[in-house]
Regions:
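Short, charged low-complexity linear segments at domain edges
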Residues: 1-25, 259-287, 326-327
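Long terminal accessory regions outside catalytic cores
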Residues: 1-69
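Short Fe-S-cluster ligation motifs
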Residues: 6, 53-74, 301, 311-327
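FNR/FR-type flavoprotein reductase catalytic core
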Residues: 141-287
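Ferredoxin-reductase
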Residues: 56-150
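Local cysteine-cluster metal-coordination motifs and their immediate loop/turn environment
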Residues: 15-42, 264-265, 285-317
Length: 327
C-alpha cells in the first residue's frame, strides 16, 4: 500500500516552530494544527509543540538578511548572469545540502524584490556561494544592475529547493540519472556532487535549450560522470531521443534515482513516461515570496480541499502532480 510521506524541511531546526505554528497551520504537529491531540505526522527527534511552549508560545526568530559583497560577476548570455558572493561563515556552512537556496535583493529595493535563487556551487573554505540567475523580470533585472565589488542583500538559509531529497540522500553505490534543462542546469550541480560523494555512477542528460553554451561545464569536468547532450522537450512532449536514452538505461541498469531539474511539464512527462517504479527527485518550481509559508505564493491546491505550502513541504514529486487542482 502506498501512502504520501510528507515532511517539513524546517522541522527540528533552529527555525522551528515557525509562524505557521502561531496560526494553527503547522505542517507536522497536530497540536499546532488546530487539533487537540498529539499525532505527529513525521517525528523529527524533537517535539515541536514543546519547543513552542518553551519559547513562550511564539515562533522562533526567522532567517536574517545579510549585506554581502559580490566578488565576481559573469555575463554568460543576454539573459544569464553568474554571481559569486562572499557570505558569512555560518551561512555558507548552512547551504551545503542539496536543495539549498537563498533570497537575493538589490539593497536599493524594498523587501518584496526578494528573488529565490538556488545555490549552484559553494566554497566553504572561502565562504562564497555561486548562483546562476536568468534575468527575466523586475526582481532579477534589479539584481543585474549590481556589479562586481558592490553589495547585495542575501536572506537565508533555505533548503526546500528540491523535492524528494530523501531519495537523493539514500541513493548509494548505484546508478543514477540526472536530467537537466535550461536554467535547471544550475541547481543540478549540488545533486550531482552528492550522488558522486555517495559512490553512484551518474549519467547527466543535459539540454542547453535556448542557451548558446553549457555554463556548468567547468563544474562537471571535476567529476567522473557520463554526459549526454540532447534535446529533451519539444512542442509539449518528450523528444524521441530522450525517450530512447531513458528506455535503454532503465533496461540495462538498476536505477536507484531519477532526478529532473527543469520545468514542471518536463518533470511530469518524464514520470508519466517511466511510471511509478522508480525513485524520483526534482527541482521545486513553486513560486516563492516570503519563504515561510505565510504569503501563500507557494501554495497549491489538491483534491479534498488540501492546501500544500511548497516552500516548506518536503514530499515525493509524484504527489505534487497527483490530484492537483488547476482551478
Amino acid at each position: 500500500m502506498e501512502y504520501e510521506i510528507i515532511d517539513c524541511i524546517d522541522a527540528g531546526t533552529e527555525y522551528c516552530p515557525c509562524n505557521l505554528a502561531e496560526t494553527g497551520d503547522c505542517i507536522l504537529c497536530s497540536e499546532l494544527n488546530s487539533k487537540t491531540f498529539c499525532d505527529c505526522i513525521n517525528w523529527k527527534g524533537t517535539c515541536i509543540y514543546q519547543e513552542y511552549i518553551w519559547n513562550g508560545n511564539k515562533a522562533k526568530n526567522g532567517r536574517k538578511h545579510y549585506l554581502c559583497n559580490i566578488v565576481d560577476k559573469k555575463k554568460i548570455d543576454n539573459k544569464l548572469i553568474i554571481l559569486t558572493i562572499k557570505v558569512p561563515y555560518d551561512l555558507s556552512q548552512s547551504l551545503v545540502c542539496p536543495g539549498s537556496f537563498v533570497f537575493l535583493r538589490n539593497p536599493s529595493c524594498e523587501e518584496y524584490f526578494n528573488a529565490p535563487i538556488s545555490i549552484m556551487d559553494i566554497d566553504t573554505l572561502n565562504n562564497t556561494i555561486t548562483v546562476a540567475i536568468e534575468v527575466v523580470a523586475s526582481k532579477t533585472k534589479k539584481i543585474d544592475e549590481l556589479n562586481k565589488n558592490q553589495d547585495i542583500l542575501v536572506k537565508g538559509p533555505y533548503w526546500n529547493g528540491v523535492l524528494g531529497v530523501r531519495h537523493i540522500l539514500n541513493a548509494k553505490k548505484g546508478n543514477s540519472i540526472i536530467i537537466a534543462r535550461a536554467i535547471g542546469l544550475a541547481p543540478m550541480i549540488p545533486i550531482m556532487k552528492k550522488l558522486c560523494a555517495n559512490e553512484n555512477n551518474v549519467t547527466l542528460i543535459l539540454d542547453k535549450a535556448e542557451y548558446n553554451e553549457n555554463f556548468v561545464e567547468d563544474y562537471i569536468k571535476l567529476y567522473n560522470v557520463k554526459v549526454i547532450e540532447c534535446s529533451t522537450f519539444d512542442c509539449g512532449e518528450l523528444t524521441n531521443d530522450l525517450k530512447k536514452i531513458l528506455q535503454n538505461m532503465v533496461n540495462e541498469y538498476d536505477i536507484n534515482l531519477i532526478h529532473c531539474s527543469g520545468a514542471d511539464i518536463l518533470i511530469y512527462k518524464i514520470m508519466e513516461y517511466l511510471g511509478d517504479d522508480f525513485n524520483y527527485s526534482c527541482c521545486n518550481n513553486a513560486k516563492m515570496c516570503c519563504g515561510e509559508g505565510v504569503c501563500g505564493a507557494c501554495t497549491a491546491r489538491f483534491k479534498g480541499h488540501i492546501v500544500k505550502r511548497l516552500c516548506k513541504l518536503q514530499v515525493d514529486p509524484k504527489y505534487i502532480f497527483e490530484g492537483r487542482r488547476l482551478i
